[in-house]
Amino acid sequence: MSDADRQRYEGLLEEMARRDAPVVIRRKTDSRLQGFIDSALRVLTLGGQDRYLTDYVTTLGTTIWVPATWEDWSYRARYKILRHELVHVQQFERFTWPGMVLIYGFFPLPAGLAWGRAMLEWEAYAVTLEVEAELDGLAAAADPGLHDEIVRRFTGPDYGWMWPFEGWVRMRIAETLTAISRRPPMP
């Protein structure tokens, strides 16, 4: 664990707290709603999404819900995930709660062709790639293992098989990497 990672993470937490609508972090295990969502996802994905409470971070409005083990994760990992999740906070602000429920959950379908969810998640995964490049270099963002993981999430049960088009996901990854590689280096 590096001191720079801790400072970066703590700085982001301070930014989150200073917002007009502060962003808060809560444990999923402290919420009945999160337990209900976990149970519903297990049923809807035929057991495919069985790690919602233990491995996944979820944003609803200005609350970022984390697993009970969140504090055990490295500062670097938490920072990367929060950057991804803050995209979802901005989406809630842009589209409102009813809009997010409709776009994320039902447009045009809840599974298989969940274009709305795929677009919202892609916006956040593009930031995931940007943060990888910022912190660990372009080679880390270009890692085929990371790309395979992103593809698996889009096409598998993690998000309810939201977008079955692997080629589309890989094309978006490639476009994002090209855009990142053309940016001037950060100081």
Question: What function would you assign to each model-found segment?
Answer:
Residues L60, W73-K80, Q91-W122, P144:
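Post-HEXXH active-site segment of zinc metalloproteases
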Residues M119-E132:
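An active-site-proximal "capping" alpha-helix that borders the catalytic cofactor pocket
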Residues Q7, K80-L82:
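Well-ordered, non-membrane alpha-helical segments in soluble/globular domains
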Residues R42-Y79, F92:
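Active-site scaffold of zinc-dependent metalloenzymes
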Residues L12-G35, R83-W97, L135, P144-P157:
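Compositionally biased, charge-rich terminal segments
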Residues M1-G48, T178-A179, P187:
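A metal-dependent hydrolase signature that marks the N-terminal structural subdomain at the beginning
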Residues A140-P187:
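Pan-zinc metallopeptidase signature
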